[in-house]
């Protein structure tokens, strides 16, 4: 079975037009038609309902089955190509949220040999985006955060820190007179928040749902520095993990919610990934360095 034929077929199931698929791949329309016929001959089934050529392409029942399997085959093919390319060069493409990049990685950098840094290609992105990139093969490794429990069985995860979430306010804010807060009491407050690809937003939604409140988010960003600056300028308050280091002028108020989510951080990679000896050594060194630190001492 030809990978290119499967690529043509999957594209046809999405675009539902032979001419559009041909244009997408810069080939002739007969090339696409021939690829579909080869698949039908090999699989001994009809994949398309051939009715009015002016109507969008429709799939038979087996055509839908083949579409599902073809998507999986192409994903595995992409993973294979990316894994082989990275293993051959002994490089590690690592996804890392800005909070981890700023608040965790610098504290272990001195434990790592200088040569290691030339073998790491860091990608800055939120934890949810990093997890997706890991599963798609765009990343070899991720140092990511998750809430409560991690249940994805396709990912090997080694957790090295767990932190609580708190409310961050300016030191001169009226809320700063409290020693602790319940999230429900903040229902009329304005919040500034990290965007949806961060687990902080998941935590915000979880607490809102548990307390049956919908606080207003007046500003959102991918940059933790922007969030802290907005809080300092009294634009809004923020829900942040205790892993975030606060600059002068800001104060952390613990939450009293019994079922408040926890911010957990770990090193993750795909179970199916086979690393070169050099890559495996890099991962072992990174993981050991993260585990050697008492993160609650900071």
Report the location of each language-model feature.
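Central regulatory/effector-binding core of bacterial HTH transcription factors
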Residues: 89-151, 220-221
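Secondary-structure junction motif
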Residues: 189-211, 275-279, 293, 297-298
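Flexible hinge/capping segments at coil-to-helix
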Residues: 154-191
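Beta-alpha-beta core module
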Residues: 152-158, 163, 225-274
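A short LG(V/I)-centered, amphipathic sequence patch enriched
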Residues: 40-59
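Short helix-boundary/capping micro-motifs
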Residues: 10-28
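Hydrophobic hinge/microswitch elements
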Residues: 126-130, 135-139, 145, 199-254
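Alpha-helical linker/hinge and terminal dimerization helices associated
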Residues: 42-43, 66-87
């Amino acid at each position: 079975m030809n990978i290119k034929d499967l690529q043509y077929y999957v594209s046809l199931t999405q675009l539902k037009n032979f001419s559009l698929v041909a244009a997408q791949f810069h080939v002739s329309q007969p090339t696409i038609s021939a690829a579909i016929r080869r698949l039908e001959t090999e699989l001994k089934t009809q994949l398309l309902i051939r009715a009015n050529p002016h109507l969008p392409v429709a799939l038979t029942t087996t055509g839908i089955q083949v579409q599902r399997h073809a998507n999986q085959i192409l994903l595995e093919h992409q993973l294979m190509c990316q894994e082989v390319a990275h293993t051959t060069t002994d490089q590690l493409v690592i996804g890392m949220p800005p909070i981890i990049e700023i608040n965790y990685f610098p504290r272990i950098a001195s434990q790592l040999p200088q040569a290691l840094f030339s073998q790491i290609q860091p990608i800055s992105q939120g934890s949810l985006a990093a997890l997706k990139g890991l599963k798609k093969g765009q990343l070899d490794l991720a140092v990511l955060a998750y809430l409560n429990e991690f249940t994805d069985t396709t990912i090997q995860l080694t957790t090295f820190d767990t932190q609580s979430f708190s409310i961050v306010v300016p030191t001169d804010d009226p809320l700063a007179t409290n020693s602790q807060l319940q999230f429900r009491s903040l229902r009329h407050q304005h919040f500034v928040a990290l965007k949806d690809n961060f687990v902080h937003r998941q935590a915000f939604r979880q607490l809102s749902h548990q307390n049956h409140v919908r606080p207003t988010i007046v500003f959102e960003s991918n940059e933790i520095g922007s969030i802290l600056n907005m809080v300092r300028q009294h634009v809004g308050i923020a829900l942040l993990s205790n892993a975030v280091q606060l600059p002068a002028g800001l104060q952390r108020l613990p939450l009293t919610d019994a079922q408040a989510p926890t911010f957990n951080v770990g090193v993750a990679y795909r179970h199916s990934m086979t690393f070169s000896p050099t890559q495996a050594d890099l991962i072992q060194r990174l993981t050991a360095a993260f585990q050697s630190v008492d993160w609650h001492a900071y």
